[in-house]
């Protein structure tokens, strides 16, 4: 009887090991079958800024997130949480098979409610937290405003770094007023602490005010870690510092003005970490896949 018991125990143990091995193999096969995301020739997969589909989200953010996954994206940059709590939004992101690598908040959020910003970022799993608009008088971005922004950004960066997060500023086209041998945007980049502040290059808002994005990267190596991939239609004039452009003037990537192969090559060489398609055209749902098709076909 003793030997029978030992035999049965051995059989049960072998069966359990085989079952565990089968389970691990199944999980590995599932992970391998799940696409890593859209990459093309980029070192890191292409993400999308969810602001692109804000109108789609009005009829249900869960359906919008599922659509984003179906387009091939696996990581996103958020801009709001659609009246959900951070935990609810994190669950919706997970259920859609997505992850949040970066999130946009407001200057007011960071000034008056840093604790909530940090809690929300950690709940959704974001590494980067940043702003895309600095409060100022309309049409008036001065040296005084730029220097106040520098102080704010360093303070925001310190608070977020202490919380294990990274702060960025996303340029928006009104900053490149001439200053010294450069612009006020150069001043902001030069005088913020690189240990505390990084930048997200919005290509449209770099291009529209007549700044060469490749030259900007080369002038400030290592300061840009994120990019918004966005363009304007051919034939439109550059030089505006308004920080705005009508939706109908925004272009499918590859059909606009920017030399994307040259820019992405420069960005990759400089060490950009995240790229987000942001489609603010009149038909983002229809145009985003066209932009993705172009971007994944780029070689350099």
What do these predicted ranges mean?
Residues 2-7:
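Sec-dependent signal peptide recognition
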Residues 13-16:
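C-terminal motif of bacterial Sec signal peptides marking the signal peptidase cleavage site
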Residues 18-47, 58-69, 125, 182-201, ...:
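Histidine-acidic metal/acid-base catalytic patches
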Residues 48-52, 78-80, 102-107, 131-133, ...:
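A cross-domain feature marking catalytic cores of carbohydrate-active enzymes
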Residues 53-59, 75-88, 105-113, 137-140, ...:
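Acidic-and-aromatic substrate-binding clefts and catalytic sites of carbohydrate-active enzymes
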């Amino acid at each position: 009887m003793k030997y029978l018991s030992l035999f049965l125990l051995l059989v049960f143990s072998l069966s359990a090991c085989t079952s565990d091995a089968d389970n691990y193999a199944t999980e590995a096969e599932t992970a391998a079958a799940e696409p890593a995301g859209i990459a093309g020739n980029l070192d890191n997969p292409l993400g999308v800024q969810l602001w692109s589909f804000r109108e789609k989200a009005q009829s249900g953010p869960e359906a919008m997130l599922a659509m984003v996954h179906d387009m091939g994206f696996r990581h996103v940059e958020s801009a709001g949480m659609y009246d959900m709590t951070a935990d609810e939004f994190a669950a919706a992101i997970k259920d859609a098979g997505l992850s949040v690598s970066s999130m946009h908040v407001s200057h007011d959020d960071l000034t008056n409610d840093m604790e909530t910003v940090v809690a929300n970022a950690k709940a959704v799993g974001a590494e980067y937290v940043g702003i895309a608009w600095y409060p100022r008088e309309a049409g008036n971005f001065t040296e005084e405003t730029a220097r106040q922004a520098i102080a704010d950004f360093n303070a925001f960066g310190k608070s977020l770094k202490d919380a294990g997060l990274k702060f960025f500023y996303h340029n928006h086209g009104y900053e490149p007023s001439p200053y010294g041998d450069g612009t006020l945007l150069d001043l902001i980049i030069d005088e913020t602490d690189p240990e505390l502040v990084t930048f997200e290059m919005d290509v449209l808002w770099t291009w529209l005010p007549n700044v060469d994005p490749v030259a900007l990267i080369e002038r400030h190596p290592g300061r840009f870690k994120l990019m918004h991939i966005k363009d304007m239609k051919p034939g439109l004039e550059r030089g505006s510092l308004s920080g705005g452009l009508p939706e109908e003037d925004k272009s499918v990537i590859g059909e606009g003005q920017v030399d994307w192969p040259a820019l992405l090559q420069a960005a990759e060489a400089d060490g950009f970490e995240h790229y987000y398609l942001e489609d603010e055209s009149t038909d983002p749902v229809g145009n985003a896949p066209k932009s993705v098709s172009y971007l994944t076909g780029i070689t350099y």
